[in-house]
Curated annotation (Swiss-Prot):
This protein's name: Photosystem I reaction center subunit XII
Key word Chloroplast present: yes
SUPFAM superfamilies, per the entry: Subunit XII of photosystem I reaction centre, PsaM
Keywords of the record: Chloroplast, Membrane, Photosynthesis, Photosystem I, Plastid, Thylakoid, Transmembrane, Transmembrane helix
Organism: Chlorella vulgaris
Family named by the database record: Belongs to the PsaM family.
Length: 31
């Protein structure tokens, strides 16, 4: 069963959002 394009887009968006959140959290803890 192939993955729908919408599911791929959602997965990429969640990964990007998680990455940005992790970077911001790391910078906040570093300061």
């Amino acid at each position: 069963m192939p993955i729908a394009d919408s599911q791929v887009f959602i997965a990429l968006f969640l990964a990007l959002a998680t990455g940005i959140f992790a970077v911001r959290l790391g910078v906040a803890l570093y300061k």
